[in-house]
Amino acid sequence: MLLGFKEYETQAQHLAEALGLPYAMVGVHRFPDGESKVTLPGRLPVHVVFCRSLDHPDDKLIQLLLAATTARKLGAQRLTLVAPYLCYMRQDTAFAVGEAVSQPIIGRFLAGLFDDVITVDPHLHRTHDFADAVPAAHVMALSANAAMAEFLHSYRAAHYESHADIILLGPDSESKQWVRSLAEANGLEYGVAHKQRLGDREILVTLPDLDLVANTVVVVDDVISSGETIAVTARACLERGAKSVDVLVTHPLFAQGAIERLRQAGVGEIWSTDSIPHPSNCIVLTNLIAEAVQRIV
């Protein structure tokens, strides 16, 4: 059985259909004081798959704790969590005395609830093995690169004037693995910008030595939250003579005001996977995730 939650119900239902599993939605009622009442089906099979993306995570983590614990009491012996976007992976070290390091804390929390944890492109910087971040019995960190490369190939063939005038650009060093993979899959030129934080809100982006004049630039990243880095990068590309700047992202967190910030910076198209529901979703991850779940069912 696959259990989903309302805000991610469409993707969860599609995954259940792809796996041939019965689907049910976890009931979540919010009380006026902010507490949650979680309700599961009264009878559960031995193996239960939970599907929920963990953007805006704090309430969701508590609800998963309640749901997973209740599932065990109802007879489930193996619990699998499919979280296409996995929260709290970005902080893997303390930058000040007394600062909580969220990655291992949340990783151990999830490993204590679920036997298997499956995610897509977790934002791991200094942690090289996903199992070190989430020490569950079985973990899988899938890559959306193939699906994104296929989308980019189809889109450029249908919409761009030629293939030769497209350049892929990573906004910082952490994006290099994604932009390089997409460029190699599509036979495109790519580069990686250098990002420097000058303060809490000021970012300096230095573009690589690429000829952007009259070229279409596609900025590629794994996560966009505030959009500030991408906005600064887009402005720099347009100032150097780029014909247009589009954006391709795996996880569209898009905090309040992010889309407006990107538009004001001159960004044209914005494409994302459906790891987090958003109007920019155009790359479906169902098949990628279903194949991973089938390997452990």
Where does each model-flagged region fall?
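PRPP-associated nucleotide enzymes
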Residues: 1-297
